[in-house]
């Protein structure tokens, strides 16, 4: 941890909101899921929690990139680019449509490093989701800040698909709707001019949490099992310009290993799922 940001360690925020039938339906259709969306009293899928507990600030408190300005909850890190590097989840009790959810944010670690791409600052945030006094889920979120510009990476040998595989694609409308439902104003996901001309990406960036959500639904569908734990790590960005693949394999009786491969079969996201024992 860097002493410059000591006062932000342990900083907390709390949000209260109800899981509405309307938002459950909107996310269901945004993700193009099969079947009917959940109605009042029915369980939502585990990573629905990514739509909960996001900060809401007036437009004049947003930075150029669309995130809330730094210096309040997040420390005033001067590095220009922010990325969702990964997260770990543990699910204790299903969230349901109609639940009144309390989401607590807590900054648990701040680390500064110097890598091949320059200075990096990593922030770990613990989020806890309670319904009344019951802890329903936890998320350990990893955010990284950097000044480095996106680089054209050398291609590695193509990754081989696992036992399960599905080809997918997305588009600006779907990315915009997911941004809206998660109240994520980061412009790299819906503002093509900003993404390409300011941040230097070739296209719109597919949200890391959206890719993780697709993987979590994919493994639940393929295995027929309920999730106990899920973790993912972003390795390289995926863009709206090309298709990508979800792939995975069982790993023992109660786990699976998962990946997102881009259109060139390069590793974009890794993930692991642990199932509720049968």
Which positions does each model-derived feature cover?
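Residues that form or immediately flank small-molecule/cofactor binding pockets and catalytic motifs
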Residues: 55, 146, 183, 237
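Phosphate-binding glycine-rich loops and adjacent basic patches that engage nucleotide phosphates
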Residues: 61-71, 89, 140-141, 171-182, ...
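HotDog/MaoC-like acyl-thioester-processing domains
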Residues: 1-12, 84-170, 238-241, 245-278
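A contiguous, surface-exposed recognition patch within enzymatic or periplasmic domains that forms
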Residues: 2-43, 157-211, 218
